[in-house]
Each structure stands twice: as C-alpha cells, then as structure tokens.
Amino acid sequence: MKPSTEWWRYLAPLAVIAIIALLPVPAGLENHTWLYFAVFTGVIVGLILEPVPGAVVAMVGISIIAILSPWLLFSPEQLAQPGFKFTAKSLSWAVSGFSNSVIWLIFAAFMFGTGYEKTGLGRRIALILVKKMGHRTLFLGYAVMFSELILAPVTPSNSARGAGIIYPIIRNLPPLYQSQPNDSSSRSIGSYIMWMGIVADCVTSAIFLTAMAPNLLLIGLMKSASHATLSWGDWFLGMLPLSILLVLLVPWLAYVLYPPVLKSGDQVPRWAETELQAMGPLCSREKRMLGLMVGALVLWIFGGDYIDAAMVGYSVVALMLLLRIISWDDIVSNKAAWNVFFWLASLITLATGLNNTGFISWFGKLLAGSLSGYSPTMVMVTLIVVFYLLRYFFASATAYTCALAPMMIAAALAMPEIPLPVFCLMVGAAIGLGSILTPYATGPSPIYYGSGYLPTADYWRLGAIFGLIFLVLLVITGLLWMPVVLL
C-alpha cells in the first residue's frame, strides 16, 4: 500500500465521524444516540473503503464506543441508576455479538465447506454433473447450476464456492472446444459457461440462509432490532417457488439471451471422466462427509422445533472431527472462517447498539411519517426496489447489508401492517440476486468478469436484464407466496 495515495482511506471514516458528530442533534434523538450513529456511519465508510480488513474496522469501532460508552452508548438516566457500572455493561455489549447463534451457524457452515474441499467431495459432485450433462451446451449450463445448488447450503462463502470450487473446474471447459479468452472464439461456448457460473452463484446465494454470509448478517440485524428471526427452514420454504423457477429458468434464459455458437460436443464429458478416474472411487471420508451433510440438511429443514440450527452445525463439526474428516488444525488455521466470524459478530454488536440507543425506533418513526398515506404493499415494494437498485453503489455485499438493512428493518418496524418476516426474506433474497447487477458486486464477480469471456458491455447488459427479471419475480413471489408460509 502506498501511503501517498491511500492515506485518504484512513482519514475518510474519521472525517465522516467528526462531521456527523458536529452537526446539530435531530429532534427526538438524545445526544449519545447521535454520537453513536456518527461512529456507526464511520464504520460503514471504513467497510466500503477498507483501509484495513473489515473485521479490523468493526473492532476499532466497537473499541471506540466501549471506551467512550458514557458519552456514546448509555443515556444519562442509565448512568444515574444505582449500581450501574458502565465498564462492565460496555464490555458485555462489546462481546455480545460473539454469543449470537447466527455467528456459530456460519462458522459451522465454513467448516462444512472445509470438509467438502479436503475430501474432494465438492469437486467430485461437480465433475459427475458435468460428465452426465455435458454433451449439450444447454445441459452443461444446468450442470453448473446444479453444482452450485448442491454446494450452496453448506458453503456460506459464495466466493469460496464460486471462485474456489466451480470456477477452477469450468475454466478448463472452453479450451476443449478451442473457445479462447479475449478472442472472437470466446462466444463459441466460453461466454455462456462463464455467465452461467456467476449467475448460478448469485441465484444459489439467495436460495439458502447459509449460502452467503450477508444472509446471516441480515438475520442477526433483524433479531437485534425486533427479537424476531427466520429459521433455516423458514428461509428455504419461503424461497422455494422462486428457487425452483430460477433454477429451471436461468440456464435456458442465458442460452436464449446469450446464445453459444456451439450447441453440443463430447469433449467436456470425456475430460470430466478422465478427471474422475484420476480421483478414484468414492472414498470412506467422502461417504462420511456426504452422510453428515444430508443429516444436517434434514435437521435444518425439519428439526427446527427440536434443535437450533446453530446447534446442528456445532454438533456436525464435532462429528467431523471425531470421524477425522477434518482435523483441529483445519479449524484453527481456517483464516476465512475466523475472519467472517469476527467481522460478522462485530457488525451484529454494532447493530445491536444502534437499536439499544434508540436510533432504529427514531428512524423508523421518521420514515413512517413520510410514508403515511400509502398502502403497506406499495411501501414494501418501493423499499425493496430502492434497496435492490442501491446495489450498484456497493462493491461489498457486507457493507451493503450493514449500511442499508438496518434502515429497511426500521422502516418495516415503524409500519406494523408490513409483515416483518416476509419483508426481511425479500431483503435477504435481494442481497444475493442483486449481486448479478455489476462486475464488482460480490466476490466471484471480478473472477468471472476477468476470465476474458465476458466483455464489459455484455456483462453490464446481461446484469441489467437478469437483475430486472430477478427483481420482478422476487416481488411477485414475495407478495403471493411468502406470506402463506411465513405468517
């Protein structure tokens, strides 16, 4: 990093904090609430600019608030209560996010992904689908979609799933048909395959609660603001019709809107068969991994009344260790899992403070006043559309969720007529589906964009078309189906 060119990334969050803190406190807010909001906004700016890793930004924000808690976190009335010790209370708040069940669910899901990777099961599943369905280009598109679909429930990093598992496999396919990157031959088959790679990643990120870290962040924000939540099964059932529709429609739609020149061939199945032969038969570790994953999915879908989803994940990780699918070193050395663990817990802590200080309720009432006179359905749809389109301005799904989701939740809470579970699920689906809009919206986007098979103009055009289709289908199913299963 060059200090002469990057110093502003460090100063910008501090400048935002100072500017907001110096502004007059809005009517209806207490001084400590406004100062807390100033630091919270500075953290969001830090997450967007990333002068340091996001987890560090969030931890610095928490440290500032906890140290200055008499002026930022607690009201004068709280401080005046007999026996109130702000030092103990601020510490309790600072680490509260780490006890949130959502944090442990996503950490467990990361370990599942490690098991998939170490055993080779994820790669084997993708290769089997490519071998069976790769004779026709359209079916190859479905093979990419189904591969993502199978991996998504237990791979909460869509970057690890899309860029780490799927992309390394499908990037080998176009050259088998002399379809080369940055060449006129790219449209032969490579462009279609690469577009299917990124669009399948975005679709599957919306289908499952554990398919993308920001989904779980949203649930944490929802729980901290309202004490309501969505279980793994709620999310799955609420998304079911839209999921089926998108899984079946998208490969065909891409085939029509971005047609490959080559329609069929045998090179891909032969290559996949060679790779599978090199892997050998299904080993005992893969079988154990497959059995545990099926068991976890069954309990996530049907066991919500008997065991918490996070406890399912925690127990399965313990079994993975006992069965030697993964080792303890795999857990302690998994930098991606610990990184998400820390920033997600920290962001949930910050969002909890935003609610505890009274900002969420104040902002919700402010929005409710400006939206009064409109039907709840119109308000809900308008908020979803605005939230969806604002994706163009964010290069991080985490920053996008943390910056805008609390405001969306506040608006819904301020209008009791808006069904919060339905609204939050629509917001969650919009996070994943909206990632298709730009070549920088989510982790795998730059990987596929930089493959040499997706020209800039094509990516933006297809992103807008597919993004619009996704938004329309989301609104329709959100209004017609989700209330049936969630209310």
UniProtKB/Swiss-Prot annotation:
GO terms for cellular component: plasma membrane. It catalyses: (2R,3R)-tartrate(out) + succinate(in) = (2R,3R)-tartrate(in) + succinate(out). The keyword Lipid metabolism does not apply. One of its GO terms (molecular function) is antiporter activity. Belongs to the SLC13A/DASS transporter (TC 2.A.47) family. DIT1 subfamily. It is a multi-pass membrane protein. The keyword Transit peptide does not apply. It is found in: Cell inner membrane. This is L-tartrate/succinate antiporter. The gene is ttdT.
